[in-house]
Design a protein with these regions (language model features):
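Bacterial N-terminal signal peptides
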Residues: 9-19
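Extended, low-complexity, turn-rich repeat/linker tracts enriched in Gly/Pro/Ser/Thr and Asp/Glu
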Residues: 116, 123-137, 184-187
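Extracellular glycan-recognition surfaces and repeat-rich motifs
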Residues: 36-88
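Short beta-strands within extracellular/lumenal beta-sheet-rich domains
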Residues: 77, 82-119, 161-164
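Boundary at the C-terminal end of the N-terminal hydrophobic targeting segment
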Residues: 23-27
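Extracellular beta-strand-rich recognition modules
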Residues: 32, 119-126, 175-181
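Extracellular carbohydrate recognition and processing domains
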Residues: 139-175, 180-190
Length: 230
């Protein structure tokens, strides 16, 4: 029987390809469609605003608010809301249209990922309490090296609209998204959903192809794989 020999370079290349394929299987819960806060870390604020997040469905419409959420999919962040759907919500004795109000505070921070796109876009609504202008903000922030470099707020309506950040100058940097609810007064809540990176043509880049850092801190792909987006 003939023997088959594998050279060290060939074996190394095979392992490299396997690592890419395994990495590509790792995506990011950018739209909260897991129905929980997978890939996001909640801070230790007592009575945390994000304890019953994400919320399910158009909960503002369920309570006749007159301001549809216009969320993507089924799940989204809305810290005024307290309804987690027909399965989990029912177990917790929650009802459609249920709320927790503006009182609770807290924040969530995403896993780390690498900026590879020209822009980032996302849905945001809720309160208009900016990061820099108020001591108690309700907003979404982009953080690089632990510092806020871009921020956005809602416009005092439950209805979310798609906003965009220019992130071209941050390409190659490791970043995180944080959603803050630090306000307990009027419109003291953020609504947030469906965040993406997009290339220079405005086409969203699949998260499983981005240089994300997974929960174990390993790079999920190689820089060479992203060249087509530049």
């Amino acid at each position: 029987m003939p023997r088959i020999f594998f050279s060290c370079p060939l074996m190394a290349f095979a392992v490299f390809l396997m690592s890419i394929n395994l990495g590509q299987a790792r995506s990011f819960n950018n739209d909260f469609e897991t129905g929980d806060l997978t890939d996001w870390k909640m801070d230790d604020t007592e009575n945390n605003a994000f304890e019953f997040q994400p919320t399910w469905g158009d909960n503002p419409t369920a309570r006749n608010r007159g301001q549809p959420s216009k969320h993507q999919g089924d799940w989204w962040i809305g810290t005024y809301e307290k309804y987690q759907g027909p399965i989990k919500g029912k177990k917790l004795k929650q009802k459609p249209g249920g709320t927790q109000g503006d009182g609770p505070q807290g924040q969530i921070t995403s896993i780390k990922f690498t900026i590879v796109g020209a822009t980032m876009n996302f849905l945001i609504g809720g309160g208009n309490h900016p990061w820099k202008d108020e001591p108690m903000p309700c907003c979404g922030n982009l953080k690089i090296d632990g510092k806020v470099v871009l921020t956005a707020t809602g416009n005092a309506t439950e209805t979310m609209t798609r906003e965009e950040w220019d992130v071209a100058k941050y390409k190659g940097k490791t970043a995180q998204i944080e959603v803050l609810d630090k306000h307990s007064g009027g419109w003291g809540h953020p609504n947030f959903d469906d965040i993406h990176q997009a290339d220079a043509r405005g086409k969203n880049i699949p998260w499983d192809r981005i240089l994300t850092v997974d929960a174990r801190g390993k790079l999920a792909a190689t820089w060479a794989q992203m060249k087509k987006y530049y």
